[in-house]
UniProtKB/Swiss-Prot annotation:
<keyword id="KW-0687">Ribonucleoprotein</keyword>
<dbReference type="GO" id="GO:0003735">
    <property type="term" value="F:structural constituent of ribosome"/>
</dbReference>
<dbReference type="InterPro" id="IPR005878">
    <property type="entry name" value="Ribosom_uL1_bac-type"/>
</dbReference>
<comment type="function">
    <text>Protein L1 is also a translational repressor protein, it controls the translation of the L11 operon by binding to its mRNA.</text>
</comment>
<dbReference type="Pfam" id="PF00687">
    <property type="entry name" value="Ribosomal_L1"/>
</dbReference>
<comment type="subunit">
    <text>Part of the 50S ribosomal subunit.</text>
</comment>
<keyword id="KW-0694">RNA-binding</keyword>
<dbReference type="InterPro" id="IPR023674">
    <property type="entry name" value="Ribosomal_uL1-like"/>
</dbReference>
<dbReference type="GO" id="GO:0015934">
    <property type="term" value="C:large ribosomal subunit"/>
</dbReference>
<comment type="similarity">
    <text>Belongs to the universal ribosomal protein uL1 family.</text>
</comment>
<dbReference type="GO" id="GO:0000049">
    <property type="term" value="F:tRNA binding"/>
</dbReference>
<dbReference type="GO" id="GO:0019843">
    <property type="term" value="F:rRNA binding"/>
</dbReference>
<comment type="function">
    <text>Binds directly to 23S rRNA. The L1 stalk is quite mobile in the ribosome, and is involved in E site tRNA release.</text>
</comment>
<keyword id="KW-0820">tRNA-binding</keyword>
<dbReference type="InterPro" id="IPR016095">
    <property type="entry name" value="Ribosomal_uL1_3-a/b-sand"/>
</dbReference>
<keyword id="KW-0699">rRNA-binding</keyword>
<dbReference type="GO" id="GO:0006412">
    <property type="term" value="P:translation"/>
</dbReference>
């Protein structure tokens, strides 16, 4: 077990691990925790009731946070022709086709979101082994395979977050920064839970959202009483 920092241990003393906190209480606790040397992300960790081994019970999509994530999202667009200028005008950080594919094949992945026009997907397929494990492979379900590259670029820059369950059926994603004021964090958190609650796969049975924990990047988790928000 890794040795915890003094700051982490001090933060953990503030949290009653037997209690489920209201959203307001949880955000107040987050604000009371000792700060790291950088502006930590605030992350949601959601345990779901899906069976992740079944292909018809995968959670994949996007949510939009009213106040964004606070992160400068680097967006890459695979496209050609007139769409190149559309993507650049919308604020994409990297735009192109063959040259980007070659860079990625050499190991470069210095971006957060990859968007592609449908005509590029056959060529991008060869990047699956590199982009797939990193959650960067463009997908129609995630809204990252589209002809409207300008809208997609703007949306991800503004705070759209891609959602995908891990191998254990859990979801992990940022909802803001610790520097956000409490009201903005609350609005992002509530909005995220409301949107996630509508993403239950049709084949999934029983409760969808089983447990919700909110935590700073370098701090302990705080269990939320999420029932009033999602049920």
């Amino acid at each position: 077990m890794p040795k915890r920092s003094k700051r982490y241990l001090e933060a953990r003393k503030l949290v009653d691990r037997t209690k489920a906190y209201t959203i307001d209480e949880a955000i107040e606790l987050l604000k009371q925790m000792p700060s790291a040397k950088f502006d930590e992300s605030i992350e949601l960790h959601i345990k779901t009731g899906i069976e992740p081994s079944k292909s018809d019970q995968q959670v994949r999509g996007t949510i939009s946070l009213p106040h964004g994530t606070g992160k400068n999202v680097k967006v890459l667009v695979f496209t050609r022709g007139e769409k190149v200028e559309e993507a650049k005008a919308a604020g994409a950080d990297f735009v192109g086709s063959d040259e980007l594919i070659q860079q990625i094949q050499k190991g470069w992945t210095d971006f957060d979101v990859a968007i592609a026009t449908p005509d590029m997907m056959r060529e991008i397929g060869r990047l699956g082994r590199i982009l797939g494990p990193r959650g960067l492979m463009p997908s129609p379900k995630a809204g990252t395979v589209t002809t409207d590259v300008a809208e997609a670029v703007k949306a991800f820059k503004a705070g759209r977050v891609e959602i995908k369950n891990d191998k254990t059926g859990n979801l992990h994603f940022p909802i803001g920064k610790k520097s956000f004021d409490s009201e903005k964090l609350k609005e992002n958190l509530v909005s995220a839970l409301e949107q996630i609650s509508k993403m239950k796969p049709a084949a999934a049975k029983g409760r969808f959202i089983v447990k919700v924990v909110v935590a700073p990047t370098m701090g302990p988790g705080i269990k939320l009483d999420h029932q009033k928000v999602v049920e």
